[in-house]
Amino acid sequence: MGPHLLGRSSLLLLLLGMWWSVRPLCAVPKGLTKARWFEIQHIQPRLLQCNKAMSGVNNYTQHCKPENTFLHNVFQDVTAVCDMPNIICKNGRHNCHQSPKPVNLTQCNFIAGRYPDCRYHDDAQYKFFIVACDPPQKTDPPYHLVPVHLDKVV
């Protein structure tokens, strides 16, 4: 009976450990709104090497994010996409919006290292993007809707 219970406990601990390691990937860091976290993760007006740009993201989460996309645009222009017609997001919600024209962006993919020395491969692209938008929170800029999630690039 003892080893049987130990096996169940080990499995539970393994599952909890896996959940804990994945959970922070999408969690908004304390003290930030969803829109501000979106801006930190995905807005980079000027071209910047992924290794440097990702350090700003990874410092909030204390781990190497596996992949991330930076839109080379200003927050105001990305927010304007929230006024485009609604489309269905990957999660089935109806609060997504597609950019009316393609933009320069950089896809960063983790290749090696350990936080804080994360190393990334840069992939420059010119594509449309789809963002999820929600009403702003109290401390967000005063727009009707603000981007809170980069759903995909197309």
Curated annotation (Swiss-Prot):
Substrate binds at residues 65-69, 90. One of its GO terms (biological process) is innate immune response. Disulfide bonds join 50-108, 64-118, 82-133, 89-96. PROSITE patterns: RNASE_PANCREATIC. It is found in: Secreted; Lysosome; Cytoplasmic granule. Residues 1-27 form the signal peptide. Optimum temperature is 30 degrees Celsius. Activity declines with increasing temperature, with loss of stability at 90 degrees Celsius. Glycans are attached at residues 59, 104. GO terms for cellular component: cytoplasmic vesicle; extracellular space; lysosome. One of its GO terms (molecular function) is nucleic acid binding. Its EC number is 3.1.27.-. Belongs to the pancreatic ribonuclease family. Ribonuclease which shows a preference for the pyrimidines uridine and cytosine. Has potent antimicrobial activity against a range of Gram-positive and Gram-negative bacteria, including P.aeruginosa, A.baumanii, M.luteus, S.aureus, E.faecalis, E.faecium, S.saprophyticus and E.coli. Causes loss of bacterial membrane integrity, and also promotes agglutination of Gram-negative bacteria. Probably contributes to urinary tract sterility. Bactericidal activity is independent of RNase activity. This is Ribonuclease K6. It comes from Bos taurus. The gene is RNASE6.
